[in-house]
């Protein structure tokens, strides 16, 4: 009986040894095949011309220059473009079919006629009260007016950035701004904003909390106001609430599907002086003021370059959504 058990054990050990030998032999054979294959590739590679799917960059020149891959999908074939312009443009052109004409011209740049939308606004002030940006890409034309420089800058800051806003109850509470990204934004037919900074005892600094006439006036009868005060200091506010709504807002970052185009003017609007605003000159540009036909021709010519500086976004903007989450 013991002899049978020894035979079984011996047979098992011999099987294990044979299996181990076979596996090692297979491993050596595979190594030989792989190394031989790699050697052949190394020898033949100088004589082969493989397809390079990268983008060729020049050895010399500025590496800051953007090189676009021409094989990428053309975004305008599946996107919508809104063009916002002042009503005076249509008045000067005086042609009932001018929008159809421009649509046909946009078609030559690859934009289907059904993807272009023209939106008129009366003036900067009225547009700032009720901005509506619904397209995948939005181009806002603003004619330069020396008397409205601040209004234009604030509107550009509003449109080119995303804001998270909450209501303010200025009758019950004091408010303070926590950092540079924190602003108070007011909208309405007439916004007059007065502030009174408070010390740690909630006493006015240079003003009386019980007398609004002693408050500092930071805006008078404006339709759009972006108020910036000293951070970390409580303020008592006085606002014309019957004609204006004020919100406590936080700047989240750039709204990359919007570009502002200044039409004419010797001075160029720039909102990048705000330390919370990243440089965005590519989405804020100027065209020379001639005639409105000339302005629109210029936009058609450069529309694709302008869109390349933008990003398609699905989030829309209107005055109601802006107050809470943009």
Swiss-Prot record:
**Metal-binding in keyword set:** yes
Q: MF terms per GO, please?
A: metal ion binding
Q: Where on the tree of life does the source sit, at the highest rank?
A: Viruses
Which is one Pfam family of this protein? VP7
Gene3D superfamilies according to UniProt: Glycoprotein VP7, domain 1, Rotavirus outer-layer protein VP7, domain 2
Where does it reside? Answer: Virion; Host endoplasmic reticulum lumen
Q: Coiled coil: which residue ranges?
A: none
Signal peptide (from-to) = 1-50
Where does the record place the region CNP motif?
A: 165-167
- Cysteines paired by S-S bonds: 82-135, 165-249, 191-244, 196-207
Q: Where is this region: GPR motif?
A: 253-255
Keyword set, alphabetical order: Calcium, Capsid protein, Disulfide bond, Glycoprotein, Host endoplasmic reticulum, Host-virus interaction, Metal-binding, Outer capsid protein, Signal, T=13 icosahedral capsid protein, Virion
Please give the InterPro entries that the UniProt record associates with this protein: VP7 (IPR001963), VP7_1 (IPR042207), VP7_2 (IPR042210)
In this chain, Ca(2+) 2 is annotated as bound at 177, 228-229, 231, 301
Q: Name one GO cellular component term.
A: host cell endoplasmic reticulum lumen
User: Family assignment?
Assistant: Belongs to the rotavirus VP7 family.
Task: Share what the entry says about its subunit structure, partners included.
Answer: Homotrimer; disulfide-linked. 2 Ca(2+) ions bound at each subunit interface in the trimer hold the trimer together. Interacts with the intermediate capsid protein VP6. Interacts with the outer capsid protein VP5*.
> Tell me, what does this protein do in biology?
Calcium-binding protein that interacts with rotavirus cell receptors once the initial attachment by VP4 has been achieved. Rotavirus attachment and entry into the host cell probably involves multiple sequential contacts between the outer capsid proteins VP4 and VP7, and the cell receptors. Following entry into the host cell, low intracellular or intravesicular Ca(2+) concentration probably causes the calcium-stabilized VP7 trimers to dissociate from the virion. This step is probably necessary for the membrane-disrupting entry step and the release of VP4, which is locked onto the virion by VP7.
Query: What does the miscellaneous comment read?
Result: Some rotavirus strains are neuraminidase-sensitive and require sialic acid to attach to the cell surface. Some rotavirus strains are integrin-dependent. Some rotavirus strains depend on ganglioside for their entry into the host cell. Hsp70 also seems to be involved in the entry of some strains. In group A rotaviruses, VP7 defines the G serotype.
Q: Which HAMAP family match?
A: Rota_VP7, Rota_VP7_A
The name on file for this protein is: Outer capsid glycoprotein VP7
